[in-house]
Amino acid sequence: MDTPSSGSDSFDFEAALKELEGLVERMERGELSLEESLRQFERGVELTRACQKALQEAEQKVETLIGQGADAHEQAFEDPAHRDT
């Protein structure tokens, strides 16, 4: 199965992420042969790169939209994992 370019309209981020999670689960169980593990790992790398590219493109789009606002200033994204509670 080929990974479509994350810039194309046919890329489904959620489906790619779900597939990646499934790959990780199968590999963590340790029941795969070495060859199958390598194939799964390679697919995981492809999915990870495509998802990262899609996220970067989304971030750029958000920054562009924010920049088009009346006060046109850049706002940093807050990482919920590092938020003070």
Swiss-Prot record:
Localisation: Cytoplasm
Enzyme Commission number(s): 3.1.11.6
Xref: InterPro entries: Exonuc_VII_S (IPR003761), Exonuc_VII_ssu_sf (IPR037004)
Reaction catalysed by this enzyme: Exonucleolytic cleavage in either 5'- to 3'- or 3'- to 5'-direction to yield nucleoside 5'-phosphates
Cross-referenced SUPFAM superfamilies: XseB-like (SSF116842)
GO molecular function, a single term: exodeoxyribonuclease VII activity
Function: Bidirectionally degrades single-stranded DNA into large acid-insoluble oligonucleotides, which are then degraded further into small acid-soluble oligonucleotides.
Official protein name in the record: Exodeoxyribonuclease 7 small subunit
Organism of this sequence: Alkalilimnicola ehrlichii (strain ATCC BAA-1101 / DSM 17681 / MLHE-1)
